């Protein structure tokens, strides 16, 4: 056996054996080799499958993560996506091969360890299953699939092959979200009993995405890969059969957070949808959708309201948890997590204590006085029930960097900053698991539960009926 081939097998067997136990076991520093200097054998060779807008976002983030080497790029838009991604990688000294056919890539690239999949939703199951069966670990963007059957096949393939599958619900690796879940909800239960949740993704949708006419994909290739036209290829999210609709495409992240924070899956859903803004000729999915979920939890029943607008961006994106003692609002887009104490139902000295110990932080005036005030004084000064309007979001210059503060002196924030691109911690988690240093934060079974939760909204909207979930439906 030649030296080069032996080194390749040793490196790959090391990474794959580490990942095999990494999903359920975290290596000690000695076992994972962290006490010795990093070697080439620690590098992870990656292929990018889908080099469009989202694929390039993930690619650019991976370029910032040590030990990640791109070896291949695959995309059917050769004159645009493929060339741009491949050239950029070479500029960063990632020598790579470019492919149109993913099967050819998986067959020829024998030195890969993992594949990052950022193709349209209807390709996710096929690309994921093929990559797993080729012996590779997979990071797959959300939505997991445009069908429940496709998501189920992905779970089964991961189990059958023993390879890792991380679904791209990146809030599960976000330090702010983790702090809120672990510390605020599980440890201290600062909100008390949660009775309701609301979330939204409001935006102004782009007009149909165009393309350079000189860079069109030929009709034969489009048809081979499931598209009727370049317009459909460029705007696939709005076509039935190509995506799971707006709640699946965009709501997967937020409904996943709600499932995670409430510790269970929904028991029922009602939904409505309509096309009020976008051109119906080029859009098959609704541009406006609203869903009402019911959850049965240990705390009691919880009502969840979720909306998507495509013509108005007021309020942006957020998840809000309403408890008897307070409200928690998180927003990945605004990079914030704030708590609004409900003083009628809670002890103001408890909230003052949270601030005094640094468990939560207040606005500048409060924090400047913290050292010289007792808990009782903080409570009387800053946590007195008043008839105040709901908080309005503003920027205050003397606040800790990276935190957006409401213009209400009772509103608190978590003492955790998130200074990385939003996808980076989730990708880092995936690569750490391959090296045997962590557990997946969104394994396929969790992604499947989210897929079931969001895809059923479409049926509810189309039929106008309240649909019940059975616990067995969330098991693949």
Language-model region placement:
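Active-site beta-strand termini and strand-to-loop segments that position acidic
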Residues: 293-298, 323
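C-terminal helical cap and adjacent loop that interface with cofactors, partners, or active-site loops
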Residues: 8, 17-22, 57, 249-266, ...
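Phosphate/diphosphate-binding loops
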Residues: 306, 310
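N-terminal glycine-/serine-/threonine-rich beta1-alpha1-beta2 phosphate-ribose binding loop
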Residues: 2-140, 152-164
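Short, solvent-exposed turn/loop segments enriched in Gly/Ser/Thr/Pro and often Arg
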Residues: 77, 99, 118-123, 145-146, ...
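Predominantly a Rossmann-like dinucleotide-binding segment in NAD(P)-dependent oxidoreductases
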Residues: 50, 54, 160-166, 171-283, ...
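Short, solvent-exposed loop/turn segments that connect beta-strands within catalytic domains
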Residues: 92-94, 296-302
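Non-transmembrane alpha-helical segments in soluble domains
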Residues: 15, 59, 74, 86, ...
